């Protein structure tokens, strides 16, 4: 059933209908459309369009339809309705007859779909927040179990300074906490109801839109009808949140792919999140992580595509806006799936402590400690930096770590170096000295874990 037709003397070309119809994807808004329709029926009572008995009949029929949709949402796709609004109205008329045709009084599909999408976004944001916090919790638990797992930290993919696997986990907790904050901020801005704004100029019925917003669970009603039906900022914000969040998950995946590689060998992934090769029987491939990394691109594409769709649109509603849903649905589905998969990867991960420690002791990751030692002895840092560089060259020539060079060899580069240098060059000393807030010292890492556990109520 089309919701328009009196103006037209010819039927739509079937090819145009297929091109124009959106039911194949906006069917996901069925529950929201029904909930919004129940609220709208109540509003129509307040302005005398419906009697209380008529509203009761409509609400009862809509609630029955809601249960039918929840039991089998795929039934919607068997219809040739133009969109979810047409489908809901058609089903309502099937149930209550002519009375169902009164429901759309004073309402446009423009404010209707804007309301439906915001309701869907609110529910989805709550799911994303839950999944985000579950992944933060998994990272904190993994950090708790691996506080003593010393490993090399990297810059430019070169071994730089020793850190711990726990400190690495907590870095991603921080990223996810920012993602959580962005979602909460987005939720505040989208939590305003456009229902009652009509096609663009507002409704001709004196409906209390603030009351209507409250019935739907919004904090308030929007202030300008033109903006309300054309606003898709919340779509852009959520896509931006997803794009940033997926970048974080992609980096997480890339790190673990490297840590899991034969070249690093710092971790082993569970059989539950890996796959094999059809040719090479020895392979154990990190497919879950590679897919997280790969799916990042489609989310970035959804954001870029939506920005390009909106950039040239005049006020108010244009059919271009129908393109807001597929990219949004796919991007947020993808983000949610990847959050869950990242937590599953952590659930069975094994950290190979000895291999991590061996790697941390290689690559002269304690060179900065020697420079700091010289500074403490009164050598200017820039000069100390040069001295240590020369000492590293000598250690490489001898095929030894810095701490294995004889004192006499070290003193060739600076006479201030004494026997007290060797404890300074140990891995534990490297960690212990990073005791400022946010550092990698055991005390700071333990405090960061405690703080995260308190924030997440673990």
From Swiss-Prot:
Example GO biological process: L-arginine biosynthetic process
CC terms in the record's Gene Ontology section: cytosol
EC number: 4.3.2.1
UniProt keyword terms in alphabetical order: Amino-acid biosynthesis, Arginine biosynthesis, Cytoplasm, Lyase
Pfam families, alphabetized: ASL_C2, Lyase_1
Transmembrane segments: none
Reaction(s) the record says it catalyses: 2-(N(omega)-L-arginino)succinate = fumarate + L-arginine
SUPFAM superfamilies: L-aspartase-like (SSF48557)
Any one GO MF annotation of this record: argininosuccinate lyase activity
PANTHER family in UniProt: ARGININOSUCCINATE LYASE
UniProt similarity note: Belongs to the lyase 1 family. Argininosuccinate lyase subfamily.
Record-given protein name: Argininosuccinate lyase
Origin species: Salmonella schwarzengrund (strain CVM19633)
Gene symbol of the encoding locus: argH
């Amino acid at each position: 059933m089309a919701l328009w037709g009196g103006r037209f003397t010819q039927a739509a070309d079937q090819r145009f209908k297929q091109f124009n119809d959106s039911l194949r994807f906006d069917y996901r808004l069925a529950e929201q459309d029904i909930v919004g329709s129940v609220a709208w029926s109540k509003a129509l009572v307040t302005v005398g369009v419906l009697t209380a008995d008529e509203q009761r009949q409509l609400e009862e029929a809509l609630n029955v339809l809601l249960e039918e949709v929840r039991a089998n949402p795929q039934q919607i796709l068997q219809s040739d309705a133009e969109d979810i609004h047409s489908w809901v109205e058609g089903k309502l008329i099937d149930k209550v007859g002519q009375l169902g045709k009164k429901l759309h009084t004073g309402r446009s599909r423009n404010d209707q779909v804007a309301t439906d999408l915001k309701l869907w976004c609110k529910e989805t944001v709550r799911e994303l927040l839950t999944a985000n916090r579950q992944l933060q919790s998994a990272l904190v638990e993994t950090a708790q179990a691996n506080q003593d797992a010393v490993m090399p930290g990297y810059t430019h993919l070169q071994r730089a300074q020793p850190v711990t696997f726990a400190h690495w986990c907590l870095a991603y907790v921080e990223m996810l906490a920012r993602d959580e904050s962005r979602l909460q901020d987005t939720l505040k801005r989208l939590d305003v109801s456009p229902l009652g704004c009509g096609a663009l100029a507002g409704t001709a019925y004196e409906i209390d839109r603030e009351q209507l917003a409250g019935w739907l669970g919004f904090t308030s009603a929007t202030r300008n009808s033109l903006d309300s039906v054309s606003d898709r900022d919340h779509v852009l914000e959520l896509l931006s949140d997803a794009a940033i969040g997926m970048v974080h998950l992609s980096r997480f995946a890339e790190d673990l792919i490297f840590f899991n590689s034969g070249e690093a060998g710092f971790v082993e992934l569970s059989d539950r999140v890996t796959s094999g090769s059809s040719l090479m029987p020895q392979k154990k491939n990190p497919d879950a992580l590679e897919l997280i990394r790969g799916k990042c691109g489609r989310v970035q594409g959804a954001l870029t595509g939506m920005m390009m769709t909106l950039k040239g649109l005049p006020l108010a509603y244009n059919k271009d806006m129908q393109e807001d849903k597929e990219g949004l649905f796919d991007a947020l589905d993808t983000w949610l799936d990847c959050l869950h998969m990242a937590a599953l990867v952590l659930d069975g991960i094994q950290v190979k402590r000895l291999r991590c420690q061996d790697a941390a002791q290689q690559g002269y990751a304690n060179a900065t400690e020697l420079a700091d030692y010289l500074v403490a002895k009164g050598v200017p840092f820039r000069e100390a930096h040069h001295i240590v560089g020369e000492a590293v060259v000598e250690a490489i020539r001898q095929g030894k770590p810095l701490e294995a060079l004889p004192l006499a060899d070290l003193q060739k580069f600076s006479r201030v170096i004494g026997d007290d240098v060797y404890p300074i060059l140990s891995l534990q000393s490297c960690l212990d000295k990073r005791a400022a807030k946010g550092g990698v010292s055991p005390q700071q890492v333990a405090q960061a874990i405690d703080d995260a556990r308190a924030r997440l109520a673990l």
